[in-house]
A protein has these predicted regions:
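Flexible "arm" and connector segments at domain edges
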Residues: 1-60, 64-112
């Protein structure tokens, strides 16, 4: 495993995705990436229900790749993706049983 993967695997995946697009002379667009996200998500769901843990892990990685491609298609820089991840972590960490509850659909929802 190379040094860039060990230091920041998400950034390495971002760069790998850019390089993949470059090798095939592909410019990601929302019209390409959104169907790919739907396809890869369906494959991840199928793997989660019927396939091995290793297959699920691979499909999850594929969902991340095509989602990063959507960010690229929209011109969103890697740093903004990371900022969004940090914001989600902050929000998740702030959710407690005092502020949220588990609704009947098993979704953590804000108390009103």
């Amino acid at each position: 495993m190379n040094e860039r993967v060990l230091n920041d695997p998400l950034q390495a995946l971002w760069q790998s995705t850019r390089e993949l697009h470059g090798r095939f002379n592909v410019q990601p667009t929302i019209y390409v990436q959104i169907p790919l996200i739907l396809e890869e998500t369906a494959e991840a769901i199928k793997a989660g229900l019927f396939e091995s843990r290793q297959a699920v892990v691979g499909e999850i990685a594929d969902v991340i790749v095509v989602t990063l491609g959507l960010a690229m298609a929209l011109g969103i820089p890697y740093e903004d993706v990371i900022a969004g991840i940090h914001e989600t972590i902050r929000k998740n960490d702030g959710k407690t049983t005092d502020t949220h509850y588990l609704n009947p659909a098993n979704k953590i929802a804000r108390k009103t």
